[in-house]
């Protein structure tokens, strides 16, 4: 047990408390033997010796009491530290499980794209009032099959220059060359609130166009 305690003393606060108990039995035994010796002197008829023995006996008893009180205090302190350690370990394990769950969901092949049910020409159907997500699947055709159909002069969008599939979001810049973007390509998981731009350049261009229109109206 001593080997295990020494091996884990740096990693577990429970073993640091055990180290405080190493000398406790020896101290108690030594003090009890001293009390026994003093008690023998107390039984002698020498009155001054009896008084001195009583005083020494009281001192030893007080020392033993303080020794036990100190160990009780150490025990309570280490109990609190152990509870804190358990709480920290529990929170760490919980956070680790959440991270593992997210990593598992984001593994390649873990997410299956929905089948496309309907082809949509997004360049004609694009709305400028509010950008909302849209699922535009093609009947009986998976995403991989649609990629092969790019050679059939289908409309392509997004930075990936692919056809429309799954949830997509439109750039609020009317002059954006890509117009619509797949959620996965721009790091979205749900429809953005308010205006959304695919890049800083698109946002600056849109703001300049809007500013120019306002100036023309004032004139």
Curated annotation (Swiss-Prot):
Q: What is its main location?
A: nucleus
List the GO terms this entry assigns under cellular component, sorted alphabetically: NuA3 histone acetyltransferase complex; NuA3a histone acetyltransferase complex; nucleus
Q: Where does Zn(2+) 1 bind?
A: 158, 160, 182, 185
Q: Which family does it belong to?
A: Belongs to the ING family.
Biological process terms in GO annotation: chromatin organization; chromatin remodeling; DNA-templated transcription; positive regulation of transcription elongation by RNA polymerase II
Task: Give the positions of the site Histone H3K4me3 binding.
Answer: 157, 168, 172, 180
- What role is this protein assigned? Histone-binding component of the NuA3a histone acetyltransferase complex. Targets the NuA3a HAT complex via histone H3K4me3 to facilitate transcription initiation at promoter regions. SAS3 then acetylates H3K14, leading to transcription initiation at a subset of genes. YNG1 is required for the HAT activity of NuA3 but not for its integrity. Mediates the interaction of SAS3 with nucleosomes.
The protein's name? Protein YNG1
Gene from which the chain derives: YNG1
Gene3D superfamilies, A to Z = Zinc/RING finger domain, C3HC4 (zinc finger)
CDD domains per UniProt: ING_Yng1p (cd17017), PHD_Yng1p_like (cd15587)
Which controlled-vocabulary keywords does the entry list?
Metal-binding, Nucleus, Transcription, Transcription regulation, Zinc, Zinc-finger
Q: Quote the PANTHER family the UniProt record gives.
A: INHIBITOR OF GROWTH PROTEIN, INHIBITOR OF GROWTH PROTEIN 3
Superkingdom of the organism of origin: Eukaryota
Q: Where does Zn(2+) 2 bind?
A: 171, 176, 198, 202
What molecular function does GO assign, one term? histone H3K4me3 reader activity
What is the protein's quaternary organization?
Component of the NuA3 histone acetyltransferase (HAT) complex. The NuA3 HAT complex has 2 functionally distinct forms that participate in transcription. The NuA3a HAT complex is composed of at least NTO1, SAS3, TAF14, YNG1 and EAF6. The NuA3b HAT complex contains an additional subunit, PDP3. Interacts with H3K4me3 and to a lesser extent with H3K4me2.
């Amino acid at each position: 047990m001593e080997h295990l305690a020494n091996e884990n003393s740096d990693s577990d606060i429970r073993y640091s408390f055990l180290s405080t108990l190493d000398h406790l039995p020896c101290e108690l035994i030594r003090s009890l033997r001293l009390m026994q010796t003093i008690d023998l002197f107390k039984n002698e008829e020498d009155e001054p010796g009896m008084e001195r023995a009583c005083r020494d006996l009281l001192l030893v008893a007080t020392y033993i009491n303080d020794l036990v009180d100190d160990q009780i205090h150490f025990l309570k302190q280490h109990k609190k530290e152990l509870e804190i350690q358990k709480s920290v370990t529990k929170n760490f394990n919980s956070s680790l499980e959440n991270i593992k769950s997210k990593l598992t969901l984001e593994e390649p092949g873990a997410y299956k794209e929905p089948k496309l049910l309907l082809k949509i020409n997004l360049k004609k159907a694009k709305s400028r009032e509010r950008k909302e997500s849209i699922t535009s699947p093609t009947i009986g055709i998976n995403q991989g099959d649609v990629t092969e159909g790019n050679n059939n002069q289908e409309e392509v969008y997004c930075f990936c220059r692919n056809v429309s599939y799954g949830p997509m979001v439109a750039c609020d810049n009317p002059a954006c060359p890509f117009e619509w973007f797949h959620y996965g390509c721009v790091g979205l998981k749900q429809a953005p609130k308010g205006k959304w731009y695919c890049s800083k350049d698109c946002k600056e261009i849109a703001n300049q166009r809007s500013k120019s229109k306002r100036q023309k109206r004032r004139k």
